[in-house]
Amino acid sequence: MNFTPTHTPVCRKRTVVSKRGVAVSGPTKRRGMADSLESTPLPSPEDRLAKLHPSKELLEYYQKKMAECEAENEDLLKKLELYKEACEGQHKLECDLQQREEEIAELQKALSDMQVCLFQEREHVLRLYSENDRLRIRELEDKKKIQNLLALVGTDAGEVTYFCKEPPHKVTILQKTIQAVGECEQSESSAFKADPKISKRRPSRERKESSEHYQRDIQTLILQVEALQAQLGEQTKLSREQIEGLIEDRRIHLEEIQVQHQRNQNKIKELTKNLHHTQELLYESTKDFLQLRSENQNKEKSWMLEKDNLMSKIKQYRVQCKKKEDKIGKVLPVMHESHHAQSEYIKSLKDKLVQEKKLSNMYQEQCISLEEELARIREEEGMRREIFKDRTNKMGKRLQIMTKRYEALERRRILEVEGFKTDIKVLRQKLKDLEQMLYKATVNARANQDLALLCEVRDSNRRAHKIQGELKNLKSKVFGLENELRLC
């Protein structure tokens, strides 16, 4: 808004001067004007406004300015509503972003819980393996006792002894080392199955040899079982220690995350509260400014109406003055005495003219100061717009980064689940292959069974160490993935 016109129309005044007033000399006029300026004080603003006599051009100019001010006021109100809508959208985006962060934290917590459950399941599997080993050892001991009793007592001619490999409705968990021993015992016990020719009484020499042979087998099996039990105990102890350490680390990490999350939430709440407060203050200040400007415009409109009324009165007074001048021209001799009064009237009119010029200069200065204030307000509004745009851009970038992190976490979780499934399948296949190899070795090599068993035990120990190394590698990979997730 530019209130200072570049070419402002001049206020026209018609001063009625008699023909005799023109004869006054220049120095006397100047002296009279100076005396009048010193003697008469400046009138009040209401008197000045009442004595203004603007022209039609000036009135049209200010009417045009008032229309421009009204249009600009409407534009500013529309822009203010747009800014309000944009701020509301920004608050909605901030709420959505906060919800996304909470969902990501919940997913991370669920992932850590799943890892803890996985460790617990592994420990349970180890316990089941140990229980299975204990039951198989007990089964072997029972079979040996039965065979010893049969060898000592002997069997009748029509008596037949049967050994069942597996009792019905029994659930077992296969293991690589004990399975080999069980198959060896089954192959040995298959010689004592139902056959009327073989199950008869044998000589005492064969019974002694078989008892010695069984004693050696029992000793080797006991040593093997003790070694495997020691390894299994160490492995379970190590896994328990690792699981306890991981659970403790997870608890500490969760506590730190909760504390940090609470701090961030408090900080976000404070910042959003401050932002809402500043936006409300800005909205109220702009609304007050627009209201004040509309009030000023209404006052200017009322002034314009008063000016129109004054102009109409001035026209009437001019008509009356013309009539009086005509009458005075007819009665010149009588008016000669009023020459001094007319000269004083002219001086007063000149004083009024000087005062009106001063008032016009003062009004122009006020308009310039108002324009400077308006420019300053516009600059502040531009700076606020730039700050608002920067904030919206930053919030959009942050939302994109958080969505990308959420998608990456989902992909990692799916890949980890698939990796665990494939590792379990590979280990099961290796276990089946090892069982088949041991079965073939025990079936084909009967001549030199002791050495073959020791070799197979040595190979099985090596493979067990190899599988333990692979399990350690898998654990290290899981720990690496957990560290990456924590860093993310």
From Swiss-Prot:
There is a cross-link at residue 51 (Glycyl lysine isopeptide (Lys-Gly) (interchain with G-Cter in SUMO2)). InterPro entries: CCDC77. The keyword Ubl conjugation applies. The modification Phosphoserine is found at residue 36. Residues 21-48, 192-213 are annotated as: Disordered. Residues 55-118, 208-488 form a coiled coil. Keywords: Coiled coil, Isopeptide bond, Phosphoprotein, Ubl conjugation. One of its GO terms (cellular component) is centrosome. This is Coiled-coil domain-containing protein 77. It comes from Homo sapiens. The lineage of its organism: Eukaryota, Metazoa, Chordata, Craniata, Vertebrata.
